[in-house]
Amino acid sequence: MSVLGQQAAIGIVVHLIFIAVTWWALQAVNIDPLIKKGKVVQARLLMILLTIAIGTAVANFFLDYLNYSQQLPYLF
């Protein structure tokens, strides 16, 4: 398995893990008072999109940090 293939596999797994963790964390937020009557589908879609956005941002931060830490030996 080449290095690029390994990085791609790690990237996919990390994104899925952080999206799942974000979904789990957002379940603690009570958005019921914010939802208008009859707008349940839109609220669920908002939670899904918010989960993907936050999870992807955190995963990108983690992967960037991992990548930068692997490149540090080239500094010296």
Swiss-Prot record:
Keywords, in A-Z order: Cell membrane, Membrane, Transmembrane, Transmembrane helix
List the disulfide bonds in this chain: none
Record's GO cellular component terms: plasma membrane
Name the domain of life this protein comes from: Bacteria
Residues in the signal sequence:
none
Q: Does the keyword Iron-sulfur apply?
A: no
Checking InterPro entries in the record gives: DUF1146 (IPR009526)
Q: Where are the transmembrane segments?
A: 9-29, 45-65
Q: How does it sit in the membrane?
A: Multi-pass membrane protein
Record keywords: Transmembrane helix included?
Answer: yes
Pfam families in alphabetical order: DUF1146 (PF06612)
Coarsely, its chief localization is: membrane
- Which cell locations does it reside in? Cell membrane
NCBIfam families tied to this protein: int_mem_ywzB
Q: Under what name is this protein listed? A: Uncharacterized membrane protein YwzB
Q: What is the lineage of its organism?
A: Bacteria, Bacillati, Bacillota, Bacilli, Bacillales
Q: List the gene name.
A: ywzB
